[in-house]
Structure formats: structure tokens, C-alpha cells
Amino acid sequence: MAVLPAMQLNTAERFFLSVKRSATGRAWRGRLDERGQARALAIAQRNSLPELLARVLAGLGVEPDGALAFLDPSIRNLMPDPHGITDMEAASKRIADGIMRGESVVIFGDYDVDGVTASTLLCRYLRHCGLDPIVHIPDRIFEGYGPNVDAIRSFAERGMTLLVTVDCGTTSLEALAEAKQLGLETVVIDHHQADEELPPVKAIVNPNRADDLSGLSHLAAVGLVFLTLVAISRELRQRNFWTGMRPEPDLLSLLHLVALGTVADVVPLKGLNRAFVAKGLIALRRREHVGATALMDVARLAGPPQPWHLGHLLGPRINAGGRIGRADLGVRLLLEEDASEAARIAVELDRLNRERQQIELATVAQAEAEAMAALGLEEKGGVVVTAGPGWHPGVVGLVAARLKERYGRPAFAIALEPGGTGMGSGRSIVGVDIGQAVRRAVHEGLLLKGGGHAMAAGVTLRKDALSAFRAYLEDALGPAIEAARRERALSIDGAVSGGAVNPTLVEMLARAGPYGAGNPEPVFALPAHTLAYADLIGGEHVRARFESGDGKFVTAIAFRAASQPLGKALFENRHRTMHAAGCFTLDRWQGKERVQMRLIDVAPA
């Protein structure tokens, strides 16, 4: 197996394969410096691990003494005491009271995958305890994000006595004050950034509130719900609630929901999050959960589910219901126990996802044209802010993500409405906190509403405030963006030849997974391979084949690259010698295994 030796790097700048500017405009750098290479050697020697796996572990920041534990993440070993989170005791006791009394409970979730899976997880638990909770997922367009006064009043009219908000509620002052006024006690389980003033509720379980010292701010809402259920189970155990007829539920059997929400919300896959996903993937592979299995089947997964499948195939289909269809479809699917009904819902979500893709493509084309005109050929400026009439509010977050990837800087896409207001979403790059900037813009009167976290935010504004908001972002984020873009390089873990790329290699690398945000998938280079062909597939993807000098080849696919610099470089350099960089995946189809490279970048050799 060929691994590029350190001496082939430019040691002063660590340019990998001497690539200073690639097709995507980035330098390639070796992930490991001299200290990192020494750590990799120590990992390999002390733990009897293959050199390449040791290099990957060192690149992830793993120390020699912790390598074996890292390769086998254990929830038992990583699980914190839930009561270390502020208000967890009050929250678990109040929900336990509701279970003991048989109260009427309503779960108010968010319409994204994290909110849907968190709502489903809590609902399944309460059903096991004998309750029949209502799950309310708000309509993105007509209700917007988080609890609203009209919904609260309808819950009170229906006799609900306990409201649990998941993945929302921290900043819902007016709506939750109304809930208190109407006698509806509320528990908030959320992970979004908190303001100084908190709503008047029974408990707010949120590691991102200022007075929380748990250090668990990296958890998704579904992970927080899981910890809350651990605390509730403990509380009910102390009250002798569990019996032979009503045994304590096996929370580990529900980790498929935690894995799906954690990956889809792009929280760091480190520590407990990584263990959640590792064990949740095992649960998904067993195909024991009717709704999740129907979703995997309609998404046509080629092989056992991996984090990439959750984030790019399963998550978008759940999201499609909340974006352009019925917001409750995702929860209905994940709660469904009848296989035929689950299949019907999954097919409907798949149809909505295809419709969403068409809407997204059309909107992206308009947004890119506007961004290109604003930035100019030299792409000057810090933040990309685009807006358009008629844009579907359900896809603006996806459009912002596309713009962020295309231009390598924070991006906002805003759907302008006939009434003179706009609803939009922003996505950021590492090192630039747009959530904080948006909250400050609300306080300064530039936005009607807004919130989020470092990497994603939502905004509502008046159309006539658009220019002022754009100028504010340039001023507030400009220095951070400039610093982040200076560090914009592609980190390479090593180089392999086409002949060394096989299923054994991929399975070995998988031991350091699951990969995702905060635990990046290793990137390898194919040095000086001939680009045998590059073809358009699926309208926007590029499939390529790279051949080594000894005639061995690797098939690669560059997703959504056809109209991007990467796709253009592939089409223009057929039959030339290129360096290629990407991640290796194992594709299982019709009983056969083959390795495919998910192409990230290329450069002339």
C-alpha cells in the first residue's frame, strides 16, 4: 500500500504533491506535521495497528494511549450524568409526574430531521409508559420556527396540561408566556443559542444557556432528549413505576433515531455523539424499525447504512415533508409499525424530495447569478446575501448551503414575500459564527426575527432592510471570514496508488469512523493518475475514472460538480495526468463489492 512519505512534501509549507492551487482554488496540505507523524508512528507501534490507520487516527487528534478506546466507542464509558445539565432534575421530575398522573402531553418539535427524530424518540418513550401524546410539527411557511401563540391556545383548548418543546423553545418568550397564562406547564429541551432572557417555563434543558456548565453544547436535540429519557427512567425507577407488566424501556434500541438526527444536524461526531452514531448505525443495519427500513429502501442504499447515507439520502427525504409538503410526515413514518403504511409514507417523502430537488435547482441558478453579479469575477466581498421573489421558503437553507460551498464563505438565501418581508436561512464556514451575528442584528433592529448557531441561522426581515443587513454582515463578519479563507486548504491524509484501493483498505479505514462533522473522513490522493474519462450523470454529477501507470483504475464521482470548477476541470482534462483527492467508499450492489472515490478535488500533475 503506497503512502506518500513525508520527504515528498514541501516541509516549509507542507504542500501535498506540491499542489498550491487546485481546481477548486485550494492548496493541498499534509494533515500531519512532524509531531503528527511521530504520533502516528507511536499509535501504530504501541497498539499494533496498520500504519495508514495510525496516520488517520493521528490526524483526528487521537493520542497513542487512547487509540484502542477510540476505535471502539462505548456509550457506557462516555455517558455523562444527565443531571449535570442545568434544569435536568426539574425537567425529569416534571415529565415523570406527567407519566405517573397519565397527563395529556403535547410534544412540539422542529420541522428538521433533528426535531423530527427528537419528537419521535420522546413520543415512543411516552407511549411505552402508557401515555398517548400529541406530536405537533409546525408548518414551516404558515407557522414558522418554534412555538406560536395560536398553537399554544389550541393545545389549551384541547385540555393539554404538559407541553414539551424539542429542538426549539429557548427564545419563544411570547408563546411560552401564553402557555403559562393558560395553565400549560412547559419543559424545553433544546440546543440553540439562548438569549439573556429565558421564557417562563418549568425547566429549560439546554447546554447552550449561559448558566449551564455541563460542557455538552455539542449535542443535537435528539441526543439531549436521549439524556433526558435516561434521567426520567432513573426517576421512575426510584418511584417503583417499572413492573413486570411494564418493564423499563431499552433506550439503546432507539439509537437509530439518535444517529439519524445527530448526523443530519451536523453536530461534531466526537465523544458521545460518535458513540451514538456508531451504535445507531448498527441498529439501522438490523432493519428492525419499520419506518426507518422503509426509508432506507426507498432511498435505495447501496450497502449497509453509513453516516453519508444518513446525511445525504435519508435526512433530505425526512426534511422534504417539512420543506414543501406535510410537516408531520417524517414523524408519522418513524412512528409507523405497519410495513405497508410505512412504505406508502416513504414513497410520498421520496416524491416530495424529488420535487424539492427541482425547486432547489431552479432557485440555486437564480441565486448564483445574483451572487456572481454582486461578487464580480474576482469574487470580492465577505458574505453572500441573495434574495428573490417567489423563492420557496422551504429550500432557502439548501440554497444557502450550495452558495457556501460554491464560494467558500458564509451565505444567506432569502425568499421575498408579497407583503414586503422575507424569510431566509444562512450557512457558515468553520470559524465564522453567523448565529451570534444574527442575534445581534435582531437586537439592533435590522431583523424582525432571527436565531441559530455558529454554522446555521434563520432570519425574517423587511425587504427594505436587506441592504442594511448585508452591510452589517460585511462589517461584523468580514475579519473572521478573511482569516477563515486564508486557512482554506484541503488536508490530505496520504496518497495511495490505484492498485492499493480495494475493499480491505476501505474496511480498515472504517474502523476510525463513523466520520462526519468534527471527525472528518480521511482524504487520500491518487498521485499522477490518467483521467481516462469524465461523464455527466444525473444531470449535475460527474463520474470519472483514474488509471495508474500499471493499468489499475479507480472509479470516482463528484457530486453536484457539473457546473462547478471541479466539474469543468474534469471535462477539460480528459486523458491528461492529474492528481485526484477524495474519500473512498464501499459500494455493495447485487452481491458485488466495489470501491468508489467520492471526488473532492483535482490538480494538474
Where are these regions (language model features)?
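Short gly/pro/ser/thr-enriched loop/turn and capping motifs at secondary-structure boundaries
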Residues: 141-143, 172, 192-197, 211-213, ...
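Active-site core of PLP-dependent enzymes with the aminotransferase class I/II
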Residues: 166-180
